[in-house]
C-alpha cells in the first residue's frame, strides 16, 4: 500500500475501540506503573509515542516537547493529525474517541500502523484521565480543530478555530495534583528518553524546550546514523577496540531488525534491546536470538580462520560470556503484534522472533567479519583473554561457594547476622569501617538487622577483570553474606547456569549501604554501587538495594536534641530554636563519621525503620546509568572531571 493510499485510509474507521476508561483514575498504577516520578514521566512518553507511531509509518519528521511556565507539557508533531471525522460506532469525532476511550486508536487497526509502541497500547486517553486539564489541537483537512477536557471529560464540542495548510497534532496537558506525588518534570529524564527515540528513528528530529524558567534548557536530537551513532554515544568514554561499528540491518521482512555493536577495552558489556522503540530492559526472545547469533558467528569465524591459539597444556573454548566482554550493542526490532511479559513491557515473549533475529544477525556478523578480518582478529584475541580470566575466576568462585552459608559452611566471620531467616523481613547493612560497624552491631534490631563491616578497600568493578574482582576480600565477604552465588556464564536464552547467581537465594530483601557523609564515604558508596550495577544488577532491578541517610548535624538546646540532614535544615532548626528560647544556647555538632554516634543515636537516626530515611537505588535509564558509571569509575580522567563539574550541584540528590 502506498503512503498516499495509507494516508487516505487513516480516518475514523481506523479507530478501533476496545474498552472504556472508568478504571484509570481508580487504579492509575495499573496503567502507568506508579504515581511517583516514573509514572509522571510516562505521561509524556505516552503522548510522544503517538507522534513516534506517525514517524514509524513515514508521516512525521519532527516532534517538539515543551515544558510550559504553568507546569503543563505540550507535545507537537507534523504527522497526519488524529482523524476528526465522525466515528460510526461511538457517534462522536474520532479525536474525541482517542482522547476519552481506553485502548482506542489507530494502533489497533493494521491498515493505519504496521507497528506501534505505547504503554501496552493504552493510548493518550490515560494521560487525559490523569490530567486536571488537557486540550488537543489537530491540523487536518484544511482546518485547525480543537477540543478541551477536564479530568478526561470533554468541556466542549470539537470546533474549527482556524485554517491550516499543514497537518499535525498538538496535545497540552497538566497532570492531576490529587493523583501524583509530584508534578515537577525532570528535564534530564525526558531528554534522555527523547535522545534514545531519536537514535532509534534515524532522521527524525525531536526538540525539547524548558520554558519554566528564563533561559531554560533546550535540546534538539537528530541522528542520521541511527543505531551506529547510538553505539558511539554510549561508547564515547571507552577506549574502542576498533573504530568501525558492526551493523546489521534488514527492513525487507515481516520483522525489521536493526543491530549495531562495537567492542572496547572495557571489561563490562552494555546491551540495550528495543521492540517498537520500547526499551525491553528484561530482554526476551529477541535478545536470546542476538546472543546466540553473536556466539555462533564469532566461534565460526575463529574456527574457520584458525584464530584460537591455545597455550601448552591449555584446553580453551570460547563462550557467549567471553564474546560479550567489552561489548556495546543495540538491538532494535519492529514486531506487528508483540507479546510482552509484564504490565510495563520489559520482556518480549514472541517465540518466533528468536529464530528471525538469530538468522539475520548471524549472517550479518559473519559477512562483516569476512570483509573486516583485522577487527575479527582483535575481537577473538580479547575473547581469549576473557576466557582465561573466566577460568581463573571459576576457581575463586568455587572458593566463595564453599564458604557460602547455603553450601552448608559458615558465613563471613565479621558478619553479625540476624536471627530471623525470612528474607522478606531481613536487612543487611554494609557498613564502612570497624568503628561504625561496632556501633551498628550494638544499636541494631538483632531480629531483622544484620551488619557486615567493610574493613578494606572495595575493588573498582569498572576497571577489574572478573578473576581480580573475586580475589578481593571485601567482595568475597559480600557475596558469601548475600547467599546468591555469583556471576558465571549465562546460556543463550539468558538463563544462568546452575550453581551461579540465583536471586531466589538472596538472604536479605533490604541491602543497605551505610557510609560516612564525607568524601571517603562517598567514594566507598560509589564503589559499592558500581559493583552491584555491573556484577549483581538483578539486586537493583529487584528493588533490594538502598542507601542509608545518616544525619550531618546534631542540634541541641538544653535537654532537646534534633538531627539535621543538610545545611539548610540545620540553619532553619537553629534559627527556630534561638527564637523560641533566646536565653538558652544552641549547641551544634557536625558528624564527620558514623563512628562518632553512639549506638542509640545511630539507631534513632539511621537504623530505626520507624524514623530512618532510606533511598532506594533505581535505574531509570540503562544507557544513562552505564554512561554514569563509565564516567565516574572508568579510566578516562577528563571524562570524570567533566562529569563531576557538570553534576557537582546535584550531589545531594544524585540518582544512579
Identify the residue ranges that each predicted region occupies.
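Conserved short strand/loop->alpha-helix "switch" segment adjacent to the catalytic nucleotide/phosphoryl-transfer site
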Residues: 26-45
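C-terminal interaction appendages of subunits in large macromolecular complexes
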Residues: 388-407, 422-427, 438, 442-444, ...
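Short conserved segment of the HATPase_c
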Residues: 82-104
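Helical (often loop-to-helix) elements that flank the catalytic cores of nucleotide-handling enzymes
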Residues: 88, 339-354, 563-569, 573-574
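Conserved ATPase-coupling elements of RecA-like P-loop NTPase cores
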Residues: 57-59, 84-87, 521-524
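Conserved helix-loop functional segments at active or binding sites
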Residues: 23-26, 30, 53, 57, ...
